[in-house]
Every structure is written in structure tokens, then in C-alpha cells.
């Protein structure tokens, strides 16, 4: 039984979990395992397979974790040989036979890179007040019933820790919990951002956290998925070993993507600033 750390760019995919007729990260992992002879053709997955989480369409990951009965020779580098460049396995760990990648995760951390300029000369975005942002985050952190911030109908009481820092025109937001309801991270960010830019009063946080259902125009839409990354999944007593060749390969792949994205942003800056 072995667990693998997987990094991926989620933007081209319809989420992590396999779905019929659409491209998903898990579907790519399974196809690679079929070609490697680890998984039989058909619809099944390897014995005792489980994943740490189900990221939404457009959401990326640095430490998605999958575990299953794997042959000794299946190193991260061997796995990568059958995967697309935007899905990279970079570490692994031998785990007990009863290990479950979903249920045994003690904590999951997501990082959201919120574009939030504080200056008022950005016509494409309302200026963000860091003080209002902090007030909203303080009110949302802790243990609450988040039923108004998820599409889930049960299991909506969670304890969420929220840390954040300003990095230039971005607020880098880290949210940690034992587990998250569906869309909870993105809706938490969306609500705090609405308070921070003045489009919603701070009192809306209390209303959203109240027992009364809030939906429709008064509800909270999810923030866009593309700035969200699954950045850590912690398992007690599991120590992952980085495959240096696979890690170098993954860094190279994502460095190229970073360069492309920065070039695209620079071109957009040039056009925007010249109009």
C-alpha cells in the first residue's frame, strides 16, 4: 500500500473526481495506471484506492494525495511517464494496509490568491479595505454551521482556521480544517471579499452564519475556482519521501507555465495601461 503526492494545474480539467465524458485529473491518473498495467481496463480503480479530496473544476493542487495497492516499482517518476505534463506525482510513502487517503487526513489546507488591490485607481476592481477584510475573516473563522455557504445539506458544521497576508495587490488566504463542505472555501473568500470592498456590510456575516436559510440574491456566490490551490494534506505518522527527479521535473513544468502566465499578464498590462 502506497500513498502518492500529486500536483496539478486544475484549469484544463473538470475537477479531480472521475466523471463520464469529461476530462478530469483522476481520470488521467487512472488512464496512466491502466497503461502501466497497475489497473485493469474498464471502469474500476486499483484495490483500496482513495483520494484526499475532490477539488472542483479549475482548482489546482500541490499536495493532492492518492493511495492504493501499488507495485514496488511504481515510483513517482515511473507514474509521471504516463501522465500529462500538467499532472505530476512528486513524492510517495509506504502506508499501513488499512490506510485511507480520505478518512485518515487530519487537516487539509487550501490557499486562495485573491486579487484585491487596495488602491482606488483600478477601474476593473473595487478597492479593498484590509481592515474590513480582517473583521470579516475574524467573524468567519472558528466553529460555525456553514449551511448558507455550501450546497451540502448535512455535515455543515466545521471548524475553520483562516490566516492571510497581503502580497502586493493580492491577499493570500490560507484556510485549514479537518475537511471542507462543498464550495465552502470559495464562498468564505467571496463573502469576506464582499465585505472588504464595501459591496456587503459586515452584518451580512452574522446573517449568513445564522440558522435561517439565506439563498438567491441574498446568498453568497462562490469565488472563481482558478485562484484556489490545495496546498497541504496532513497525515499523522506518514512521512513522504520526495522523488528528486520527479520533483525537478514537476518544478520545471510549472515554472514554464508560470513564465507563460506572467507573459500573458504583462501583455494585458501593456494594452490596459495604454488605453
Swiss-Prot record:
EC number: 5.4.99.12
Annotated source species: Haloarcula marismortui (strain ATCC 43049 / DSM 3752 / JCM 8966 / VKM B-1809)
Catalytic residue list: 56 (nucleophile)
One GO molecular-function entry: tRNA pseudouridine(38-40) synthase activity
Enzyme class, broadest EC rank: isomerase
Swiss-Prot/TrEMBL keywords: Isomerase, tRNA processing
Binding site for substrate: 110
Domain of life the protein comes from: Archaea
Record carries keyword Isomerase: yes
Role, per record: Formation of pseudouridine at positions 38, 39 and 40 in the anticodon stem and loop of transfer RNAs.
Keyword Cytoplasm recorded: no
An example Gene Ontology biological process: tRNA pseudouridine synthesis
Reaction(s) this enzyme catalyzes, per UniProt: uridine(38/39/40) in tRNA = pseudouridine(38/39/40) in tRNA
Pfam families recorded: PseudoU_synth_1
Family: Belongs to the tRNA pseudouridine synthase TruA family.
The name this protein goes by in its record: tRNA pseudouridine synthase A
